[in-house]
């Protein structure tokens, strides 16, 4: 054989164009290369860890053996460019654009209202596009699997799924209630349209068809390259790492002998994360992706041999094919593997992660290794000394030195045997989320019986997620051999395993009791599964099994969500050109879908631009003894290090410093920043800054700590009505308790982003920032630099999600960057990594609510005394406003005649918490709903009856003495009861629960009264600038910021109506403090209200100027009138202004008319829980919302759905975990789980109530951006109802309050049974726990 040649030339294609790189840097990933090198910015950075899908691209390769081209999606943030030799990459720009033509996927996701902020949209588009390249008519299951690796924080997924579903060969709909016609295609005649309810948000028939022949062809040059000899070693040398990709097995083995410590990389899904988050680098990395022997598939009578290089998707496809061809008794192991592969990671990760990498990494949460370990699988390994076989058993998985690969050995393939007739294998896993989440605990279990008996001859049980490695219950298994498979064996096995499978207190990951309970619960499920199969083989030989028990073996199905959205159609007499009230597509929808929408970090890098990385505190409360940045300053590419000493003006606001100076008050506080010529260099240098601390006591982390040390921010707030103490004495019953609500991360898809560009004279600066409040950012930067605000111009084109998290924080971060820009005299780009964003910026306030309720036996509440404590973190931020709002809105929909509410903000050593969608209402009203449920349980009454009994019924006054009319509240409630068929379904739930022991359903209906607005009058003002050009085109600028909530779309609609011109004439450029100064924050659901009035005012001014010209020439065109106005020297630009509602609260008197109006609503949700694992399935949700006269029903319904799913996450999924020292563990989607596409309700119906006038807002509309968040608690209380049903059946006492979020752990441990009782309770006093609740 001729010696292998060496080449340093990397060749691949991007969107049909050839890319050639010599000595490519192995540490450069595809995402960076696309965005910063070849300037394709449609692919977005969302997390950097492959978990969010924002950077999804399609990769295509040609296989010279099969002569086939494969297409697969991948997350570009984890793909090293060196791995792309011979590949074709397709990005969102490559499939369509507004400059050429848009692709059907792009069109449908945009016109189907599947975009809001648009940051996740390119990734969604590319996931769907790749699926269609492989399956032009996909199944619904394929769509759900495909989208499982993509996250969206705005839409609630329903419109995205619906857009994708339009490509299925047949889509389900209501069929006109059985008439056999599609509701989306039904046209109504004019008389029927008058005052009718519409259910069509877009015209499906307008979609262009999918034509697979029009896609990009695979480059012929790459086909020729693949056909050529593999006798080439590719070598790419970077700054710190050399990448070597051999072409033959001999070359690979020689390299591994020469570099035994060099890691092997194919998918980079493990090593990439390890290198990124630990800053570990390897001198040599070897890529065996071109070694044909690693991709072998051999199927014999003995079993399957699977190449170690096969991706998990390829393994899944192979196993599916084999299982379809063999009898079930031979495929037990294969079926178990398939079950795990369906939910292991997201589709993009499964497409690139290799089987061998999954095995060799030996991660404790590996889903496949426990099955392979009990399946007598064999590892075929090779070295220069020859081939060797290593058993893949518990010793290998535990890392026993004699049982694992030697450094010079390479895993070639894995042999997975077929199962025998009397062999039974099962797999189990429970994760925080159904898809794309590491398992909390998983297991592989196998039993072999003596032929035709139930006598155990072999037993194997392996658990993942219990210890530092996959662990075996080997001792228990050996003791059970020879026993019969019966209940006595099960009881003994549970006790043995509970004793053997130990989990120390404070074990990493926490949840010690829950994890041990899962281990035993899985054993019981295995027992039932095997018993069921034995019974199937011989119905007479084995005892009957109650159907009430067998239901636990049914996994929650992966079903596609569907629903109906209904709203009031516009009057049939309304001109077609008038867009108000119509479901108009998001103004930037197409640009979102094509990747052409420009976000802050998409802007081109200027010559000399520097990148900023911050150094944050590692201590919660400490004195800074010394700071040594000398090593960082000497690092490659570093220009400067910026500290508090460099701040020329104010170093922050109130108690919040830009740069910590003498003391740090939380983990994550910015101490200094490194400016370098690349982000990588800045990051690497930042890690070299040495800071010496001295701890300061006390360290306050939790609300309880704050209460102990009386550590508060601001005064106690209090509201009271009636005579509370007297009413308590008259009550039949009194109930006291407390409830805890965890915090929530904003998780906007675009992390905090800012660019600061010094203009070179008069200290002027342009600031491009992702902010809800450009004027506040301008003010903070000006104060920091000690210059007037007129030298600072803030630009906000669009924001990739905000939810309150980009109101005050961007001002702080922009100021940090501005100091660096002024010091260096160069442009600064400061984009937070997801981990840093979550660490630094805070989120929703965790809450402790204490309540005392006095009520009558019929459920009527006479008195309530409620005390709220929120964890504000280390600085005030907006915390005082949040507690005020929580108190003002706490009563929700209920008239409690004697009510006292008090609230305090606790000052702790956590990062400062801040504004979040709902602003205190989701926390405060949750406490009230907990009280309602507790009263219902105590009185043994239906919860809905207690809620109805206590609701406002007539015009009345709130606890802060503001009058309101509850008519629409009651209508929403009644409509929700009717739309959801509540009482019929409640009966069905009861019947379901009677038939099942281990699965229970619950249903709950929750009303809502949401007060819209800010607490001060000055917030209700806005300005706009409308300019008409001589060609008739119109440019609109206003003070609101496009966050994804559709404000720009609505402003164009307003201008279109007022100017009586088509929307196509109107353009919005950006929000800028030059065009519209002194703006207020875009938030509190008022953005469209106030800015719409300002745009309306400006347009009316212009129309009044044009009025004489129009009267003189009534038959003229818009263009003619505009030109004539110019000829007559009439100004064609106008500033509109709106001064709105008077809103002031007198806390001394406890009263104030502070809210312009109320939004009413109701939601009914049904869930199903698995009592053995704690998993739950959201079956159906019906929402009715009072939106008055919606300006844009598509936008408003999208806001309701997105807010609801965000609330669903708050109350059931999203859990921030802190160490006792105040360190946030959950710093990315890897650990922190927001709702994914499989978490939303199977049926998801949203109805806008029949409109009624609302004179306080433009066109009688209402702001609906926040209200739906709280309605997510309907899922929580449905879960609570299901748990209550389980506890009642077990003879347990009711639980008055379940803490939020109702995670799988909370659900499982509340459903107490014989298995939870086996697990000894941990004593938190004996040692420090791994994590603690902070409220």
Curated annotation (Swiss-Prot):
2Fe-2S ferredoxin-type domain location: 8-95
Active site: 1266 (proton acceptor)
Regulation (activators, inhibitors): Inhibited by potassium cyanide, menadione, benzamidine, raloxifene and norharmane.
Record: residues binding [2Fe-2S] cluster 1: 47, 52, 55, 77
Enzymatic reactions: an aldehyde + O2 + H2O = a carboxylate + H2O2 + H(+)
Entry superkingdom: Eukaryota
Occurrences of domain FAD-binding PCMH-type (ranges): 236-421
GO cellular component assignments: cytosol
Cofactor annotation: [2Fe-2S] cluster; FAD; Mo-molybdopterin
Listed EC numbers: 1.2.3.1, 1.17.3.-
Subcellular location(s) per record: Cytoplasm
Keyword terms of this UniProt record: 2Fe-2S, Cytoplasm, FAD, Flavoprotein, Iron, Iron-sulfur, Metal-binding, Molybdenum, Oxidoreductase, Phosphoprotein
InterPro entries: 2Fe-2S-bd, 2Fe-2S-bd_dom_sf, 2Fe-2S_ferredoxin-like_sf, 2Fe-2S_ferredoxin-type, 2Fe2S_fd_BS, Ald_Oxase/Xan_DH_a/b, Ald_Oxase/Xan_DH_a/b_sf, Ald_Oxase/xanthine_DH-like
Induction of synthesis: Induced by testosterone.
Tissue specificity annotation: Highly expressed in liver (at protein level). In liver, the expression is greater in males than females.
BP term (GO), one: xenobiotic metabolic process
GO terms, molecular function: 2 iron, 2 sulfur cluster binding; aldehyde oxidase activity; electron transfer activity; FAD binding; flavin adenine dinucleotide binding; iron ion binding; molybdenum ion binding; molybdopterin cofactor binding
UniProt effect for mutating residue 1266 to Q: Loss of activity with different N-heterocyclic compounds as substrates. 60% reduction of activity with benzaldehyde
Residues that coordinate or bind [2Fe-2S] cluster 2: 117, 120, 152, 154
Assembly and binders: Homodimer.
Record family assignment: Belongs to the xanthine dehydrogenase family.
Function: Oxidase with broad substrate specificity, oxidizing aromatic azaheterocycles, such as N1-methylnicotinamide and phthalazine, as well as aldehydes, such as benzaldehyde, retinal and pyridoxal. Plays a key role in the metabolism of xenobiotics and drugs containing aromatic azaheterocyclic substituents. Is probably involved in the regulation of reactive oxygen species homeostasis. May be a prominent source of superoxide generation via the one-electron reduction of molecular oxygen.
Protein name: Aldehyde oxidase 3
Lineage: Eukaryota, Metazoa, Chordata, Craniata, Vertebrata
């Amino acid at each position: 054989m001729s010696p292998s040649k060496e080449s340093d030339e990397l060749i691949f294609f991007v969107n049909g164009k050839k890319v050639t790189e010599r000595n490519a840097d192995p540490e450069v990933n595809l995402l960076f290369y696309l965005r910063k090198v070849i300037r394709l910015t449609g692919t977005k950075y969302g997390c950097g860890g492959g978990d969010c899908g924002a950077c999804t691209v399609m990769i295509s390769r040609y296989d010279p053996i099969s002569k086939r081209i494969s297409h697969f999606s991948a997350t570009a943030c984890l793909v090293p460019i060196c791995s792309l030799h011979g590949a074709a990459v397709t990005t969102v720009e490559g499939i369509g654009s507004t400059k050429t033509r848009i692709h059907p996927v792009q069109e449908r996701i945009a016109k189907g209202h599947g975009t809001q902020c648009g940051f996740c949209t390119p990734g969604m588009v590319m996931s769907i596009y790749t699926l269609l390249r492989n399956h032009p008519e996909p199944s619904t299951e394929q769509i759900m699997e495909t989208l499982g690796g993509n996250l969206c924080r705005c839409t609630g997924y329903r419109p995205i799924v619906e857009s994708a579903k339009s490509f299925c060969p047949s889509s389900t709909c209501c069929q006109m209630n059985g008439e056999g016609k599609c509701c989306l295609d039904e046209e109504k005649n004019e008389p029927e349209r008058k005052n009718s309810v519409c259910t069509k948000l877009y015209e499906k028939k307008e979609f262009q068809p999918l034509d697979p022949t029009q896609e990009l062809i695979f480059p012929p040059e790459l086909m020729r390259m693949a056909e050529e000899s593999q006798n080439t070693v590719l070598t790419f040398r970077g700054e710190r790492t050399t990448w070597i990709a051999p072409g033959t097995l001999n070359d690979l083995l020689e390299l591994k002998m020469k570099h035994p410590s060099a890691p092997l990389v194919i998918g980079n899904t493990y090593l990439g994360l390890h290198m990124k988050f630990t800053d570990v680098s390897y001198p040599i990395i070897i890529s065996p992706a071109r070694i044909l022997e690693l991709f072998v598939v051999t199927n014999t009578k003995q079993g399957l041999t699977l190449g170690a290089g096969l991706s998990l998707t390829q393994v899944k496809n192979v196993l599916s094919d084999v299982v379809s061809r063999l009898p079930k008794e031979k495929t037990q192991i294969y079926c178990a593997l398939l079950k795990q592969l369906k939910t292991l990671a997201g589709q993009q990760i499964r497409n690139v992660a290799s089987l061998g990498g999954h095995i060799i990494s030996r991660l404790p949460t590996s889903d496949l290794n426990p099955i392979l370990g009990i399946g007598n699988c064999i590892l075929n390994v090779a070295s220069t000394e020859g081939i060797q076989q290593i058993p893949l058993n518990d010793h290998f998985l535990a890392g026993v030195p004699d049982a694992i690969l030697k450094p010079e050995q390479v895993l070639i393939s894995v042999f997975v045997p077929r199962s025998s007739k009397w062999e039974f294998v099962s797999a189990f896993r429970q994760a925080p989320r159904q898809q794309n989440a590491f398992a909390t605990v998983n297991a592989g279990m196998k039993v072999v019986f003596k032929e035709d008996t139930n006598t155990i001859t072999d037993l194997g049980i392996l658990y993942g997620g219990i210890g530092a490695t996959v662990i075996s219950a080997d001792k228990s298994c050996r003791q059970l051999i020879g026993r019969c498979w019966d209940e006595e064996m099960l009881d003994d096995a549970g006790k043995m395993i509970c004793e053997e499978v130990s989990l120390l207190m404070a074990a990493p990951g926490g949840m010690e009791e829950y994890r041990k309970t899962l281990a035993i619960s899985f054993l019981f499920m295995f027992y039932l599964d095997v018993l069921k199969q034995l019974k199937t083989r011989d119905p007479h030989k084995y005892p009957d099994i109650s159907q009430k028990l067998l239901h636990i073996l049914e996994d929650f199905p992966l079903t596609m969500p569907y629903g109906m959205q209904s709203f009031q159609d516009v009057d049939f007499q309304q001109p077609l050109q008038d867009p108000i009230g119509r479901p108009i597509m998001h103004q930037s929808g197409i640009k979102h879908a094509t990747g052409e929408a420009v976000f802050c970090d998409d802007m081109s890098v200027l010559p000399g631009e520097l990148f900023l990385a911050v150094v944050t505190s590692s201590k919660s409360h400490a004195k800074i003894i010394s700071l040594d940045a000398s090593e960082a300053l000497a690092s490659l590419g570093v220009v400067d290090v910026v500290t508090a000493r460099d701040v020329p003006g104010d170093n922050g606001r109130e108690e919040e410093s830009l740069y910590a100076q003498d003391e740090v008050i939380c983990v994550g506080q910015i101490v200094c920043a490194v400016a370098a010529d690349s982000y990588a260099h800045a990051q690497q240098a930042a890690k070299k800054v040495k800071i010496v601390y001295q701890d300061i006591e006390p360290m306050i982390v939790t609300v309880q700590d704050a209460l102990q040390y009386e550590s508060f921010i601001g005064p106690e707030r209090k509201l009271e009505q009636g005579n509370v103490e007297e009413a308590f004495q008259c009550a039949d019953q009194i109930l006291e308790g407390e409830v805890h609500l965890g915090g929530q991360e904003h998780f906007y898809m675009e992390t905090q982003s800012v660019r600061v560009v010094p203009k070179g004279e008069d200290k002027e600066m342009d600031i491009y920032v992702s902010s809800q409040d450009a004027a506040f950012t301008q003010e903070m930067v000006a104060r920091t630099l000690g210059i007037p605000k007129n030298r600072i111009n803030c630009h906000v084109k669009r924001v990739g999600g905000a939810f309150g998290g980009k109101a005050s924080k961007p001002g702080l971060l922009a100021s940090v960057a501005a100091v660096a820009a002024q010091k260096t005299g160069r442009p600064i780009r400061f984009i937070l990594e997801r981990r840093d964003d979550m660490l630094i910026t805070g989120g929703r306030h965790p809450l402790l609510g204490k309540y005392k309720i006095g009520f009558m036996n019929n459920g009527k509440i006479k008195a309530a005394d409620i005390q709220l404590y929120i964890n504000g973190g280390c600085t005030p931020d907006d915390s005082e406003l949040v507690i005020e709002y929580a108190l003002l809105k706490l009563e929700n929909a209920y008239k409690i005649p004697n009510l006292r509410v008090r609230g305090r903000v606790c000052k702790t050593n956590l990062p400062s918490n801040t504004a979040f969608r709902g602003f205190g209402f989701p926390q405060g009203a949750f406490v009230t709903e907990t009280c309602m449920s507790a009263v219902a349980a105590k009185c043994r009454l239906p919860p809905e009856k207690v809620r109805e009994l206590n609701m406002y019924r007539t015009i009345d006054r709130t606890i802060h003495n503001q009058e309101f009319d509850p008519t629409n509240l009651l209508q929403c409630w009644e409509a929700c009861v009717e739309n959801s068929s509540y009482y019929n379904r409640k009966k069905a739930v009861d019947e379901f629960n009677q038939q099942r022991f281990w699965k229970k359903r619950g249903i709950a209906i929750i009303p809502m009264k949401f007060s819209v607005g800010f607490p001060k009058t000055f917030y209700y003002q806005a300005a706009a600038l409308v300019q008409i050009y001589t060609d008739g085109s119109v440019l609109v600028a206003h003070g609101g910021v496009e966050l994804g909530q559709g404000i720009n779309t609505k402003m164009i609609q307003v201008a279109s109506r007022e100017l009586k011109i088509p929307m196509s004439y109107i353009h919005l450029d950006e929000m800028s403090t030059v065009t519209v100064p002194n703006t207020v924050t875009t938030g509190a659901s008022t953005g469209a209200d106030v800015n719409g009035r300002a745009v309306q005012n400006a347009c009316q001014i212009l129309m009044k100027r044009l009025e004489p010209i129009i009267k003189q020439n009534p038959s003229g065109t818009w263009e003619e009138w505009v030109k004539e106005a110019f000829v007559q020297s009439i100004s064609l630009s106008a500033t509109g202004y709106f001064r709105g509602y008077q809103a002031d609260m007198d806390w001394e008197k406890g009263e104030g008319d502070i809210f312009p109006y109320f939004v009413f609503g109701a939601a009914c949700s049904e869930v199903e829980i698995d009592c053995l694992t704690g998993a739950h399935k959201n079956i159906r949700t019906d929402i009715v919302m009072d939106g008055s006269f919606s300006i844009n029903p598509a936008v408003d319904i999208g806001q309701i759905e997105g807010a609801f799913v965000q609330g669903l996450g708050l109350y059931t999924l999203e859990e921030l975990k802190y160490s006792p020292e105040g360190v946030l563990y959950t710093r990315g989607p890897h650990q922190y789980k927001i709702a994914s596409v499989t978490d939303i309700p199977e049926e998801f119906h949203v109805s806008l109530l029949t409109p009624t006038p609302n004179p306080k807002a433009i066109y009688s509309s209402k702001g609906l951006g926040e209200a739906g968040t709280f309605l997510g608690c309907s899922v929580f209380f449905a879960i609570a109802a299901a748990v209550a049903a389980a506890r009642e059946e077990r003879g347990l006492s009711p639980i008055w309050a379940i803490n939020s979020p109702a995670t799988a752990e909370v659900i499982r441990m509340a459903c107490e049974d014989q298995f939870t009782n086996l697990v000894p309770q941990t004593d938190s006093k004996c040692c420090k726990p791994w994590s603690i609740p902070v409220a």
